[in-house]
């Protein structure tokens, strides 16, 4: 779970990315839930490339650890260099990629697969801030997958201490398990 906060006047867009490559897991049955705690204009809201979670592509993701203007210690970093390909130029071709986003009221939610390409507009209107609660959910096909390029957040130590190894099912010993 995470809370994202941007102060009034911030004009920073969250780069296009997918969530799963950052995580210590791999699997298709994943859901991220993004819930603004304040009203959000469409231009500031999360935007998506519909259907991109079904593309069989690995893209070079943004290292969010680089976005650390205060140079804080212990910030998780990743390095996606190597066999991954660059993201397509979505911003210059938004219509071609059918990019979608919405005005959202406080408490509205959008749920999406962790492999879908998404990013934040980040263009906050005058007098507006952005506060978002985000949570991730994992399904039965999801397995532990420690990644050599790093993870953000990096739960690998916690998972290894709980006896989990790459290929194992993520169990409820450190992550709550819900039966629906």
Model-derived regions, located:
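Conserved double-stranded beta-helix
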Residues: 1-48, 53-54
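Conserved hydrophobic/aromatic beta-strand scaffold that supports enzyme active sites
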Residues: 2, 32-36, 99-101, 109-111, ...
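Activation segment
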Residues: 7, 57-58, 120-121
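Short, surface-exposed loop/helix-turn segments at secondary-structure junctions
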Residues: 18, 82-95, 127-129, 148-153
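A short beta-loop-beta micro-motif enriched in histidine and acidic residues
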Residues: 19-30, 97-98, 104, 128-129
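Glycine-rich loops and low-complexity Gly/Arg-rich segments
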Residues: 22-29, 39-41, 57-62, 71-75, ...
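Double-stranded beta-helix
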Residues: 42-117
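Non-heme Fe(II)/2-oxoglutarate
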Residues: 61-64, 106-111, 115-180
